[in-house]
Amino acid sequence: MAVPVPLGTEDRTSRLTLRRPDRWRREDAPQADLRLTGDDAVLTVRSRPSERTIAEEHTSLLERLPGSVDGLRLIGCDPWTTAGAPARLVEYVRPDEEGDVAGAHLLFVTGRHRVDLTIERPLARMLATDDLVSAVLESVRATEPAPSRPQRELETLPVAVPVPQLDGTHLGADALLTLRSLAGRRWDPMLLRSPAGRELVQTGLVGRLGTLPEPTQELIAPWADDTQPVTLEQRLPDGRTTRLQAWSETVVDGTDETGGTVARLPVERVVALAAGRLGIRPSWTFPFRTGALDADLLARRTGDAGTAPDLPAAVAEADPRLARFWAAPWTVSSIRRPGRPTPVVVVHAEGIGFARTGRTEAGETAFRSDSPANVYRSLVRALLG
C-alpha cells in the first residue's frame, strides 16, 4: 500500500492547480508556465492553444516522443481521471549523460488549450520517488471548463519498437564455461591447447600468450565471488526458450547448452535490453473479472506451448477480456533475483498486454492484468533495486 505523502503548498497557473511538498522550490523558466524542483525531481508545466481532442493530442505525443531523444523508450500510458479534464499519463525513460531519466508526462485538454505537465527524476530514484510523484500528479486540477464532447473509445497505440540485440562476443558453451572459470584465477597455459581456449584467443578475450586484457578482466570480475545473477528466462510463443543473465554490468545472453553472447554494459542499458525482450511499450490495461484460475490449468498454459489448454467455456463466457488474452500467443517470462526463491512471472499476450501470476492457494493461482509500466518497475527493482 502506498504511503500517504504530505503535500503542503499549492501552485497555480492559468490552466491548472497542483499541490507539492513545501521543500520543493519554484524556479525561473521563461519557456514554461511553471518549474519546480526537489527530491531529485524536476516538474515542468507548459500549455498552448489547441482545439484537438485528447485522443488526437495523445496520439501526436506518442508519435513525437521517441524521436525527441535518441534512445527514449515509452514504457506505458493510461487514461487519467482525476484532473477534471480528458487526460492521459504517459511514462518513458530517456538516456542522459549522468544516467537514465524516468519521466511521467500528464497531458490534458480543455477544448481551448493543451496542457503538458512532466516530472522527471533519475531512473535510479524511480522506485524511491514513485509515491511522491503519484501524489503530485493526483493533485493536478484543470482550471478551465472541460470539453463537452465525451471520448467514447480509446485511441490506437503505436506498434512495438524492434527488440534491441546484445552487441558482444558470441561463445560456444565450452568457451563460455572456460571464460567463467578464469575469474579470480591465473590463466592456465594448458587451456590454450583446448578448443575452448583457442576460441577465447580467436575472439580476442584472451591474449595469445595467455594474458587477460583489461576489458576481459573487467568482464569476468563479477564471477570471481560466485555472485548469483539476475535472470530473465522466457518461453516464446513458438516454444523456444531464451535466457538473459546479468551480474551487475556483465551480461550473458544464452544458455549453458548452446553458449551465448557475453558483453559488459552499463546496468541501465541492461534494463533497456530486458525491457525490449519483455515487449514493454504503451498498451491499455483493463482488469480481468476473474481474479484466480485453476493452478494446474494455468501451469499448463504457461508451460509447453504445444500443450496449451483452452480456457473453460464458463470462464470465457463470464470474462471475455480474459478469454481474448488467453487466446493470444503468449511469451512467459520469469525474473529471478538472487536470494529470492520465487520468481516474478509475467505473461505478455501478443497485441494485448501483460498479466502477472501470483500466489497459489487452495488449488487456485492468482492471475491479474498488469500495466507495462509496472512490469518495467519489476525490472528496475531486480536490476537497480
Language-model region placement:
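Secretory pathway targeting signatures of secreted, lumenal, and periplasmic proteins
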Residues: 2-68, 78, 99
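Surface-exposed amphipathic alpha-helical segments
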Residues: 22-24, 117-152, 370-385
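Short, surface-exposed coil-to-beta transition loops
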Residues: 30-31, 99-105, 240-241, 339-342
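Signature of long, low-cysteine stretches enriched in small and polar/charged residues
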Residues: 60-110, 134
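Short beta-strand segments that buttress and anchor functional surface loops
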Residues: 88-96, 231-235, 333-336
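Short, amphipathic alpha-helical interface elements at domain boundaries
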Residues: 146-201, 205-211, 215-217
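Accessory beta->alpha helical hairpin/"wing" motif in late/C-terminal subdomains of nucleic-acid enzymes
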Residues: 169, 193, 203, 207-276
